[in-house]
């Protein structure tokens, strides 16, 4: 957003410094439309660059958690994952799947995705992914909504989270939806366990 603000300031100062006189009343709305279009284009490329940056960062974060070892490896890794950018967390899951040789589908944007944070294919079947960073128990309604989504789309689902799975949420789990959390999630992200051995 700072880039856009700088751009707007630049255009406004340019008009003032050049003492541009616009006599035609139709020029002002035309200029306004062009102005808005340029801002939209800049915003689009800004969001796209943010997406590329997060994908690139996800591979670095995977390397980082691989380096976390020792007696408190589990607690340290979970604590680390709970603090990172939630969108990078989504990309980390997809990046690990890609590194494990699966066909992945990244979203073009992070909002308005309909509850889907990515997709991948395994054994000819399409899986939807939902990734959530929790510090405590997961929200049951999130699980129910995701389960309804995959049922309507007739696909399988992978619900990945950093929290705790309560009994109410576990009751929703079925043959079409798998939870990936706790040690299994860490082993997967560290490439010590393949996703095919989990789903």
Model-derived regions: residue spans:
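Mixed-charge (Asp/Glu-Lys/Arg
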Residues: 1-114, 119-199
